[in-house]
Regions:
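Solvent-exposed residues in well-ordered beta-strands and their adjoining turns
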Residues: 56-58
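UBC/E2-like fold recognition across ubiquitin and ubiquitin-like conjugation systems
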Residues: 1-50, 60-136
Length: 136
């Protein structure tokens, strides 16, 4: 995907994410003003889980909040049971990355979270998703 067409603040956020934690982060799709950002090192609660996932970021980031996560396999807790909170298998939100294996949508929103004010807040977004996965 040609990232040069994305808004400057979004590109700054993506570059910061690559520099700080996710060197392989990339945008695999854009649909309805949301970019599907692949993060290969997304830490999951269960060590046997396949790595990575797509964070749905508005192309207006940081002026719009993240909304959802797409994974190839259902997320599991440390005990091996499935994370069912806001889990939607084969949801329409998976379609932009379905050909890459996206099959499980978690409709986690940024409600009641710290305000995002800067493109560099992207690292905190990733950490928030990892905490949410651990909590199940």
């Amino acid at each position: 995907m040609d990232e040069s067409s994305l808004p400057t603040p979004f590109r700054i956020a993506l570059e910061h994410l690559r520099e700080k934690t996710q060197a392989e982060a990339r945008v695999d799709a854009v649909c309805n003003n949301f970019a599907y950002v692949w993060v290969s090192d997304l830490r999951k609660a269960n060590a046997e889980a396949p790595p990575g996932g797509w964070i749905r970021l508005p192309t207006a980031f940081p002026f719009g909040n993240p909304h959802g996560l797409v994974t190839t396999e259902p997320l599991k807790r440390e005990d091996g049971s499935r994370v069912t909170d806001a889990h939607h298998p084969n949801h329409d939100m998976c379609k932009p990355v379905q050909s890459l294996g996206g099959a499980n949508y978690y409709s986690w929103t940024w409600q009641d979270c710290p305000p995002i004010r800067d493109p560099r807040d992207i690292v905190g977004v990733l950490q928030w998703y990892e905490r949410r996965i651990r909590r199940g």
